[in-house]
């Protein structure tokens, strides 16, 4: 079996990350001076994760410089894992840390592109939460999309279908500015919710999407539409979306012809790089080395 060092040595993509939470805990602890008890640890779903964010991480991020420091740590830890393509979500709300100075915000992102371009290709995606005030999104989404800094859009938040029609306008804007369209669904929700989100938003990619594995028809639908699911196995286990790594549906999805990419999601919380995830999945028999090579090849 190929070693962990082999997977670390291979160039790879990380196609599902959140840029403010994608550094290793040790680096974050050194920067913030904050020790999170019993961490990283398996959690009781997103509610417990958000409790930790509210108590330990959000209070440490107050200024534009704090945001930039977090982003920088995340990018450097990705590079250390030989990530050469990083698709990473930047929440629209960080404009408030920049005192609503859009030029300053965009300039910092542009500078990150330039600073690290020899090591990694960064694809910034505009992250928008479903619980964000609509007036705020309407104020900032279009100028951010129009800037050319963002290549993708990512809608996240509660995985419920009720009221999602309210977000169609965001994806129409994304189409206007030629952004790739993503949304979080199927992490805890079912196969039909995955199909519904893909259809109503005309998604190019799904963030997670593992709920689709319970329905062969939905897997076929995703495969036929060539919709990629950006799956985060360790995150799914740590948040109790999946009982254990051995029971993760990533292989079933790949074998059904669904395009699958691999992501760390929030490295700070889940503690496994993509190299480590590949090694762990092969080691436990979840996937074969051929599956691992296919995931390494994704860009």
From Swiss-Prot:
Disulfide bond positions: none
Annotated active site: 187 (proton donor)
Cross-referenced InterPro entries: A_deaminase_dom, Ado/ade_deaminase, Metal_Hydrolase
Residues the record marks as site: Important for catalytic activity: 208
EC numbers, comma separated: 3.5.4.-
Protein residues bound to substrate: 18, 157, 266
Tree of life domain: Bacteria
GO terms for biological process, alphabetical: nucleotide metabolic process
Cofactor: Zn(2+)
Gene3D superfamilies assigned: Metal-dependent hydrolases
Listed GO MF terms: deaminase activity; hydrolase activity, acting on carbon-nitrogen (but not peptide) bonds, in cyclic amidines; metal ion binding
A Pfam family per the record: A_deaminase
Cofactor, free-text remark: Binds 1 zinc ion per subunit.
Class of the enzyme per the UniProt entry, highest EC level: hydrolase
Annotated residues for binding of Zn(2+): 16, 18, 184, 265
Keywords: Hydrolase, Metal-binding, Nucleotide metabolism, Zinc
Function statement: Putative nucleoside deaminase. May catalyze the hydrolytic deamination of adenosine or some similar substrate and play a role in purine metabolism.
Family: Belongs to the metallo-dependent hydrolases superfamily. Adenosine and AMP deaminases family.
NCBIfam families in UniProt: PRK09358.3-6
This protein's name: Putative adenosine/adenine deaminase
Organism of origin: Treponema pallidum (strain Nichols)
